[in-house]
Amino acid sequence: VVFRGIPVVAAVFLPWRDSGSIIHARIDNGTFENDRRLKLVGGESPQRGRLSGLPSYYWAMFGFRNGLRRQIGEIRSLGSVVYELALTARGSMQISLFYSPKIWDVAAGVLLVKEAGGDVRVRTQKTHGWEPFLSFGSRTTTLQELYDWRGTILAGDQNITQYVSRRLIYRRRLLFRLRRWLQDKR
């Protein structure tokens, strides 16, 4: 649920183990897996043996500085943005990176990660830098503006997202810009 541009309640069903698991959060009340409170704890930088959620085309979209490519970990793209964010909130993935998801793909996951003590960053269009995610719009954002929202999202433990965001280079590729423009025209 998004209220005035801010995710306030989230729940995601993870269809695994015997009967599955529900990861849920409410703003200012933490993230829980069923009844167990989740708390993200990471290191200073990504670890090679841990999972990281990146889009399958990450190598064409992003460059890596200062050895980040060797540190980024075991890369996975599971096909569900909210599922990857839920796994990030529970600590199964150390980071998740998404190029241009829609609000309905990330709203629940953003709250899950933040309420688990994690950090969510969004890449700005003006400076192409990374800023902490605050909301999907202002208090007066219209439904159409929410529908049209798209942003590059990086989520995980605060130390790790800061480390990665300082070493991640966005490659402006004409083909990707053309595809996005065509998608937006549909």
Task: Describe each model-derived feature in a short phrase.
Residues 1-28:
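DPxDG-like acidic metal-binding loop motif
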Residues 15-17, 56-58, 156-159:
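Short, flexible beta-strand-to-coil junctions
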Residues 38-114:
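Phosphate/pyrophosphate- and phosphate-bearing ligand-binding catalytic cores of soluble enzymes
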Residues 29-34:
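Short polybasic amphipathic segments
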Residues 69, 86-186:
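Oxyanion/phosphate-interacting regions
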Residues 24, 42-48, 144-147:
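Solvent-exposed alpha-helices and their adjacent loops that cap or buttress functional pockets
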Residues 8, 48-49, 149-153:
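Short, surface-exposed beta-edge/turn micro-motifs
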Residues 13, 25-26, 37-44, 165-166:
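Short amphipathic beta-strand/extended segments with alternating polar/hydrophobic composition
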